[in-house]
Amino acid sequence: MIAKIIMCVSLFIQSSIEIDRATTYNAEVTQCNSDPLTTADGSRIDLDKLANSQLRWCALSRDLIWDEERQKLHNYDTSVFRGFFRFGDTIVVESISSPQINGKWVVRDCMNKRYKRSIDFLFDPKNNKPKLGVCPDVRIINK
């Protein structure tokens, strides 16, 4: 509990969190798991809303997400699920080089455990998703 309070205070002191790796993904088996339309928090992806840009959902690396239930599953490993954000939180993203990702996104998913300080933006595979590569200037704004 004390660690969570310290992290929250730290976030409020910071004006933003710099992201090391920002990418895009699609709800496909090759990029997710065997049920790509269900996110880590149990939300179902509505492909029609996604196609019409009505869904702005993202996945964060496990070091940025706070989830007590998942901490138990990982034997309270301090490197996972002890971050600043919870599933369902709305975050504000800013990027100078990729303005199409600027704005509000809802945290609904988490990334593979090999990623740290990373964000993955969900886009419709039929639409032209932005080609981010590894975007160097993405940050989550504390507003």
Outline where the language-model segments fall.
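Sec-dependent signal peptide recognition
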Residues: 1-8
